């Protein structure tokens, strides 16, 4: 997260927690016409998977956080507040969140290139807490990336495991009407050649 996003997350986290939810992270996207402030919320781990985030949760957080932002005023100028569940391609904001998703695949965008690349996709292998880094399996190699160099990270959903992968038909389906073999144009419908 950016410094501004981290500042806002630290400010709003107690408010979200007071509603019985967890603030996963914040995206602050400044723009000339007005910034976007996006909050990702989830239910605490102890309540998963029995409970999931719903629209009512997002509305409650939006109301409470809006009131707090009006008082604290950490953002100058106009902005749009968005409150969202993380979704299946959830963003990862902290080392703890990377640790929770060990064994899953993630897409990572770096602040500064590493090995000539800024974009990686690989399996999250482990967290090196001492080095404050995440180790990924990328193209058959272990790649250690410093947490401070990660700009954005998202889980890559395993659509097959979720039962949402598109199915390919194993054999050709039935022929559609109107696709029968056509008769040569010089034969009549009765099968006799036409006199011209």
Curated annotation (Swiss-Prot):
GO CC annotations on file: cytosol
Q: Where in the cell is it found?
A: Cytoplasm
What keywords does the record list, in alphabetical order? Cytoplasm, Ribosome biogenesis
Sorted alphabetically, which SUPFAM superfamilies does this protein's record hold? YhbC-like, C-terminal domain, YhbC-like, N-terminal domain
- Which Gene Ontology terms describe the biological processes this protein takes part in? ribosomal small subunit assembly; translation
The yes or no answer to whether the keyword Cytoplasm is present is yes
Instruction: Quote the CDD domains the UniProt record gives.
Output: YlxS_C (cd01734)
Q: Where is the composition biased (Basic residues)?
A: 173-182
On the tree of life, the source organism's domain of life is Bacteria
Q: Which segments of the protein form a coiled coil according to its record?
A: none
Chain positions covered by the region annotation Disordered: 164-196
**Pfam families listed in its UniProt record:** DUF150_C, RimP_N
Its job: Required for maturation of 30S ribosomal subunits.
UniProt similarity note: Belongs to the RimP family.
What is the protein named? Ribosome maturation factor RimP
């Amino acid at each position: 997260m950016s410094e501004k996003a981290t500042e806002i997350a630290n400010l709003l986290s107690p408010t979200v927690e007071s509603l019985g939810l967890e603030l996963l992270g914040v995206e602050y996207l400044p723009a000339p016409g007005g910034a976007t402030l996006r909050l990702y919320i989830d239910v605490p781990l102890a309540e998963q998977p029995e409970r999931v985030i719903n629209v009512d949760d997002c509305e409650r957080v939006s109301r409470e956080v809006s009131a707090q932002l009006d008082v604290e005023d950490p953002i100058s100028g106009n902005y749009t507040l968005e409150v969202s569940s993380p979704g299946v391609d959830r963003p990862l904001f902290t080392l703890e969140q990377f640790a929770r998703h060990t064994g899953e695949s993630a897409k990572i965008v770096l602040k500064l290139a590493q090995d000539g690349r800024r974009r990686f996709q690989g399996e999250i292998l482990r967290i090196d807490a001492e080095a404050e880094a995440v180790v990924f399996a990328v193209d058959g190699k272990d790649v250690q990336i410093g947490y401070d160099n990660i700009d954005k990270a998202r889980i890559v959903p395993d659509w097959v495991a979720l039962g949402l992968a598109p199915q390919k038909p194993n054999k050709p389906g039935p022929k559609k009407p109107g696709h029968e073999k056509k008769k040569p144009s010089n034969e009549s419908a009765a099968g006799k050649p036409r006199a011209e």
